């Protein structure tokens, strides 16, 4: 699995990027955990609003998980990898969003956590 991660602000730009259908054949918001909102844009707005009361400017931790080119990875394997990564990074229980994209028949995942306690 190829992992790319970054701390970042700009939640609305990230939400727009993750919801782009012109770049992906299929898109699925798989999970929104710990948010009052029921959609990705509003969930990231929540985190941004909370961050305004702190000094934190990079209030999101974004991770993409891409399997090797020919691998067909089931959703459960992505979920297990995300759980292990979350534990290692100390992000257990933090609000998170998981989005799946499929591009040219290949599934990959994005997981975004709030860094604000």
Model-derived features: positions:
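N-terminal nicking endonuclease/strand-transfer module with a His-rich metal-binding environment
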Residues: 1-117
